[in-house]
Amino acid sequence: MMDGTHAIKRSRSRSPKVSQSKSSKKKKRSSSRCRSGSDSPARKHSTLAKYRAEVPDRRKKERRKKRRKRTVSTTSSSSSESSSSSSSSSSDDSGDSTCKSKRSSHRKKKNKKQIKRKKAKKNKKLKKKTSFKLECQDTKSTEKEVLPGPSVNPCKKESPEVSGPALTDEQKSRIQAMKPMTKEEWDAQQSVIRKVVDPETGRIRLIKGDGEVLEEIVSKDRHKEINKHATQKDGLEFQMHSGMF
């Protein structure tokens, strides 16, 4: 039995169709190898030419991509910078607005305080004026109550009444001296110049007003005698002081 099966297999494997197919495949492979061996340098040359032609195109494309990336990066950076600058400007504007609002509020508070102070000062002044007016009115009313009659000047003194005989010139002069005088009367009295004779020396003096001595009128002989007496007195005083006499 075993021998029969092996024989069948061998017969099947050695069938003419199978052997033809195998031979055709081998021929195709050998032909393809021959063609590839004969055509390999031409193909290699064409592939190198294609690669060399494609290299600059690829480089150009890569450069374009890099440029695009750069432009995109620059635009993104510029946009980020603009956004940052806008944010900083907005923050600055907000800070300025807050500072301005604070300053305005501070000024308003100051103005309110100043207005209040001015009003308080005015009220104080008005109160003082009203109180002073009331005090003046009160004093006037009290004076009227105390002095209902005619007003009496304390400076004007009544002349003393003398009963008996008539007054002498000395008494009259004393009474006049006791009376107050006006400025005009005083000037008139002081402008009067009188001549007075001294009985002891015999000099004539010009006296203005109450006692101002203007000039002494003396004769020549009397003037010489006065000078002699003056020199003698001066010499005696000098000797007394020096211890000579």
Curated annotation (Swiss-Prot):
Residues 135-146 have a biased composition (Basic and acidic residues). GO terms for biological process: mRNA processing; RNA splicing. The keyword Nucleus applies. Keywords: mRNA processing, mRNA splicing, Nucleus. One of its GO terms (cellular component) is nuclear speck. Residues 1-171 are annotated as: Disordered. The keyword Zinc does not apply. It is found in: Nucleus, Nucleolus; Nucleus speckle. Its main location: nucleus. Residues 72-98 have a biased composition (Low complexity). May be involved in modulating alternative pre-mRNA splicing. Belongs to the ARL6IP4 family. This is ADP-ribosylation factor-like protein 6-interacting protein 4. It comes from Xenopus laevis. The gene is arl6ip4.
